[in-house]
Amino acid sequence: MYAVFQSGGKQHRVSEGQVVRLEKLEVATGEKVEFDSVLMVVNGEDVKIGTPVVAGGKVVAEVVAHGRGEKVRIVKFRRRKHSRKQQGHRQWFTEVKITGIQA
């Protein structure tokens, strides 16, 4: 059984027991989170596709950790001008473990 849900402007395909990195959520570590915007649920041959969301669909997860991703380097370089600009960015994320899928 797996589900596709939306969080942080992105869609994630998950199954129970899976650990997923999402955009940062303002929830403490160890707390439960419920995602109501379930777009699709598949249980064997039974496929439920939402228009746009599945009625009564819910993905329940537990927050495992918060952190920051790998550094992305942004470089702006102008040739022949002796000009260079560097910048870095590390995006915050929340790691959750999927504990239940309901349809």
Curated annotation (Swiss-Prot):
GO BP: translation
SUPFAM superfamilies in the record: L21p-like
Any single GO CC term annotated in Swiss-Prot or TrEMBL for this entry: ribonucleoprotein complex
Keywords: Ribonucleoprotein, Ribosomal protein, RNA-binding, rRNA-binding
Keyword Transit peptide: no
Example GO molecular function: structural constituent of ribosome
Main function: This protein binds to 23S rRNA in the presence of protein L20.
NCBIfam families from the UniProt entry: L21 (TIGR00061)
Subunit description: Part of the 50S ribosomal subunit. Contacts protein L20.
Name the UniProt record assigns to this protein: Large ribosomal subunit protein bL21
Taxonomic source organism: Glaesserella parasuis serovar 5 (strain SH0165) (Haemophilus parasuis)
Gene that encodes it: rplU
